[in-house]
Amino acid sequence: MKTKAGFVALIGKPNAGKSTLLNTLLNAHLALVSHKANATRKLMKCIVPFKDKEGYESQIIFLDTPGLHHQEKLLNQCMLSQALKAMGDAELCVFLASVHDDLKGYEEFLNLCQKPHILALSKIDTATHKQVLQKLQEYQQYASQFLSLIPLSAKKSQNLNALLECISEHLSPSAWLFEKDLMSDEKMRDIYKEIIRESLFCFLSDEIPYESDVIIDKFIEEECIDKVYAHIIVEKESQKKIVIGKNGVNIKRIGTNARLKMQEVGEKKVFLNLQVIAQKSWSKEEKSLQKLGYIYQRNRD
């Protein structure tokens, strides 16, 4: 069997549709999806098998990254550093740009990325044919920069094979790097954590999802059931009250939604215990971010 394998960084502005694209390619719910920008905070490896037209069985390891953005908040700097690290580690990049975005995000990416890349135009199902053609024409001024320009829709599964074919074409022959049926090298407890975070984005509004995170205190994995004990961390006591809700209605909704998704992903029953704590300025403190597993490289210049 002829095989290829390689790491591909998936880069884009917040809400470009990176996580939706990966979940569609995997046919599974692993990456956090929200209509709110900047939902993804940590790099995740997602492994997509693909047989290309040359007969190679390719193992494409996508590095799902936080959206490219610049803010002074320490947490946001951590997120940006992960996207930059992914670009450095990958042999190929895919820049995902919404058909509704201007070209500024792509121009910023060009200044940051030194690797060969494919430009993918996402969400074409939400635009008219004329709008898609116009946006493709706008990007043609950078034709010498990208390997290929591919319009696609993850929601409608349009042109996804074309994207995978193009990626496989630019990977080198190699033995597979992971087991055949593995979709991610993430531990189940980390996937469960992201599912809880996604539920926060689903049921909470305004700034609360951005000023919250999840810590798995205890994870017990048994044959027929996973037991998850976690707490949601917020910045203020007032936010804690909102997360819990009157008579606990909000935390029950969040917990039920998360538990059902966990059971779908884990293919077994899940017991979920959620608590809420308030810790002032956790997203601005390096010690707190280290505890939560975010990578941060301080600029010492």
From Swiss-Prot:
One example of a Gene Ontology biological process annotation: ribosomal small subunit assembly
Molecular-function GO terms, alphabetical: GTP binding; GTPase activity; ribosomal small subunit binding; small ribosomal subunit rRNA binding
PROSITE patterns: G_ERA (PS51713), KH_TYPE_2 (PS50823)
Alphabetically ordered keywords of this record: Cell inner membrane, Cell membrane, Cytoplasm, GTP-binding, Membrane, Nucleotide-binding, Ribosome biogenesis, RNA-binding, rRNA-binding
Residues in KH type-2 domain copies: 204-280
Region (G4): 122-125
Gene3D superfamilies tied to this protein: 3.30.300.20, P-loop containing nucleotide triphosphate hydrolases (3.40.50.300)
Pfam families found in the cross-reference section: KH_2, MMR_HSR1
G3: annotated span: 64-67
The protein, known as: GTPase Era
Lineage, highest ranks first: Bacteria, Pseudomonadati, Campylobacterota, Epsilonproteobacteria, Campylobacterales
Gene: era
